Amino acid sequence: MTTVSIIGKGTMGQAIAKVVTAGGNTAELVGREDAGKPLAGDVVVLAVPYPAVADVLAAHREHLAGKIVVDITNPLNFETFDSLTVPADSSAAAEIAAQLPQSRVLKAFNTTFGATLAQGTVGEGGPTTTVLIAGDDADAKATLAGVIEAGGLRAIDAGSLRRARELE
């Protein structure tokens, strides 16, 4: 059994928690009021908007070393909706990985809506929801894929962390 700490109690955080628990794993939902507290999970999901990531990392950095950290953000420029707010040769996940050298950073869940995750299918009776996973650590990807698949969804290895930009 895997324990997954999900930082963010919004729509995505709750949907991911539903997937985690559907597979018999444990989900810990973490909010602002929990800043600085130890995280129970070996897997930590950053289910917050990209502009909030810096504050989340500052509040939890010491508890992220050695953990699998899953970035679900899309660093979209919400003023123009036509570009990302990270450098052209980078991604939100790469920026997070640079700040967390002791963690195994993955990109996942950012191409799927919360409702689709919670429902488990694309539309009523449609195909099983698919979650793309990008990252450089095969064991970390296998751990996350196991949690996703146990929850009834499909997990696909999307390649290295360099692929995160395409997913964003």
Regions found by a protein language model. Give the residues of each.
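NAD(P)+-binding Rossmann beta1-loop-alpha1 motif at the extreme N-terminus of oxidoreductases
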Residues: M1-A35
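Residues at the starts of beta-strands that form the adenosine-phosphate
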Residues: T3, T26, D42, T130, ...
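Active-site phosphate/pyrophosphate- and oxyanion-stabilizing loops and adjacent acidic/basic residues
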Residues: K18, A58, A94
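Rossmann-like NAD(P)-binding element
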Residues: E28, A35-I68, I72-T80
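Solvent-exposed alpha-helices and their adjacent loops that cap or buttress functional pockets
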Residues: K37-P38, E62, A98, T121-G126
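Rossmann-fold NAD(P)-binding glycine/threonine-rich loop
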Residues: T73-V122
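Internal alpha-helical scaffold of NAD(P)-dependent oxidoreductase catalytic cores
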Residues: Q99-V105, G123-A164
